[in-house]
Amino acid sequence: MRLELAGATVDFPAQGVRALAGVDLVVEEGEQVALLGPSGSGKTTLLRLLLGAVRPSSGRVRVAGLDPFGTPQELHRLRRASGVVWQRDDLVPGLSARINAVMATAPTWGPRDWLMVLTGGVPARYAERLRALSRCHGVDACLPTRVERLSGGQRRRIALIRALLPGPGLLLADEPTTGLDPPAAVAAVEALRCADAATLILSTHDLGVARRFPRIVALRKGRVSFDGPGLCQQDVERIYGVAGVAS
């Protein structure tokens, strides 16, 4: 899915905050981008903007030619084609990890699928993919367990599987390595990068994570401060506004 922002500005007047300031950005279909920047730089706001969850004060937003702020039908099509991993997982307590993992596929369910899920199963067309993803991320034994009994790292991996399971055309990940140990963080990033031909934007403040991507877009105070394939020491210092930041 091709993404285009033209002069995108997002203001939160009640807080007196300009979260994004005239952002111009084009991401081609199938491209993988690390969105880098310190806390408060506008990374999460940009992801929410692409999903139609926050409205621009000015500027233009298009996702695969769709206007997230156009018709309800456009927004519905966009969200059905998108997979999202938020920094704070929104898993449903009281339900098993298995049911939480398949929830993103619910728009495709028929009556038999609903019955299958309500009795603890998985729609047949997703069962093998769920098994493969859960084994890959080391949580296959956790699937029957209610999510409130899982560790933070296990919950992160279930949220990641949920985003990957439908095979979305657009993947948005907001600090998806939070709470993961280094090997699990690398596995999570590579799983997102290996998703089937999906356009991927992953936000992070971690330079090591960002450098795993062929393109890095950095935000500082709501503006694009860097867009390219790699970072030098001067770039890092400009992004973070502090001299001597390790690159």
Regions found by a protein language model. Name each.
Residues 36-38:
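The feature captures the beta-strand-to-loop junction immediately N-terminal to the Walker
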Residues 51:
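Helix-to-loop junction immediately C-terminal to a conserved catalytic motif
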Residues 59-70, 78:
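Conserved ABC transporter NBD signature motif
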Residues 146-150, 154:
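Conserved ABC ATPase signature
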Residues 160:
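Hydrophobic anchor residue at the start of the ABC signature
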Residues 163-164:
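ABC ATPase C-loop
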Residues 171-174:
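Catalytic Walker B motif of ABC-type/P-loop ATPase nucleotide-binding domains
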Residues 223-246:
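Conserved beta-strand-loop-alpha-helix hinge in the C-terminal portion
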